[in-house]
């Protein structure tokens, strides 16, 4: 594997899942694989689970790890071509990227959507600059449009907990006080569409995701109807995608907060969320603290998904 930015990069999902469950049983099975290999993790945005789980995955494989927080201990970086650099950014990303590539074997990049220009975001400008100019395999630790490490962990979790071969999985929008990127819901939809699950997306009108991510999923604007008979509920906020509303909050309707009321019509569904979660905005205390909440095992599987991805990237170096 030469890069990891979307579900297509992982190849056959059954094979990837088999590898994930193998690593779950013995996390240090491939500890010699990464000997004398260096991972560089580059963060343009904050992180808890991604930072810790990816570092742990690299250690599982015997790698050296370097972490760089852009704009915190490093020069501020200009990201756009054609800019007259007479401001507070003394270095351009197009010089910084190949320099970073000199010091490592694999690069992970975390760079969120800015919500200033949809084309800039959805062209994955920053991530693709790393792919083009670093000379190293690059993987996404959440980019403007996708969060594949999270989605792979979500898939592992569903496969662990499902009680039927073809579960009903519902991704629901929920309110949040701040506008959040579409990366997690886009990516989750992309990965669910790559399975044979019964996959439903529910959200208020105006929160439609980009068609290439919705794919063949059923879109239901009635949340209660969408929840009926569900085996898994995946809650997530996202800002508007369409038109002039891109990046905006259109609603904070707490009727969409996942509570016992909605969960009562499910098939005793498991509750999932990528974390961090705003309690009593996204989900009530009772639901996230219930026995059906699997947000912690879901987070634990971030280490597993990252280990599989790094293992395959290392193997691709040979």
UniProtKB/Swiss-Prot annotation:
Q: Which domain of life is it from?
A: Bacteria
Annotated N(2)-succinyl-L-ornithine binding sites: 142, 176, 236, 278
Which GO molecular function entries does the Swiss-Prot or TrEMBL record give? Answer: amino acid binding; ornithine carbamoyltransferase activity
What EC number(s) does this enzyme carry? 2.1.3.11
Q: Which residues bind carbamoyl phosphate?
A: 47-50, 75, 110, 147-150, 274-275, 302
Question: Keywords of this protein's UniProt record, alphabetized?
Answer: Amino-acid biosynthesis, Arginine biosynthesis, Transferase
Reactions that this protein is recorded to catalyse: N(2)-succinyl-L-ornithine + carbamoyl phosphate = N(2)-succinyl-L-citrulline + phosphate + H(+)
GO biological process entries: arginine biosynthetic process via ornithine; citrulline biosynthetic process; L-arginine biosynthetic process
Q: In which pathway does it act?
A: Amino-acid biosynthesis; L-arginine biosynthesis
Residues making up the signal peptide according to the UniProt record = none
Amino-acid biosynthesis as UniProt keyword? yes
Q: Which SUPFAM superfamilies match?
A: Aspartate/ornithine carbamoyltransferase
Look up keyword Signal and say if it applies. Answer: no
Q: What class of enzyme is it?
A: transferase
Q: Which InterPro entries match?
A: ArgF'-like (IPR043696), Asp/Orn_carbamoyltranf_P-bd (IPR006132), Asp/Orn_carbamoylTrfase (IPR006130), Asp/Orn_carbamoylTrfase_sf (IPR036901), Asp_carbamoyltransf_Asp/Orn-bd (IPR006131)
General function of this protein: Catalyzes the transfer of the carbamoyl group from carbamoyl phosphate to the delta-amino group of N(2)-succinyl-L-ornithine to produce N(2)-succinyl-L-citrulline. Is essential for arginine biosynthesis. Has no activity with either L-ornithine or L-aspartate as substrate. Also has no detectable AOTCase activity, being unable to convert N(2)-acetyl-L-ornithine to N(2)-acetyl-L-citrulline.
What does the similarity note say? Belongs to the aspartate/ornithine carbamoyltransferase superfamily. SOTCase family.
How would you summarize the oligomeric state and partners of this protein? Homotrimer.
Q: What is the name listed in the Swiss-Prot or TrEMBL entry for this protein?
A: N-succinylornithine carbamoyltransferase
Organism of origin: Bacteroides thetaiotaomicron (strain ATCC 29148 / DSM 2079 / JCM 5827 / CCUG 10774 / NCTC 10582 / VPI-5482 / E50)
Which gene carries the instructions for this protein? argF'
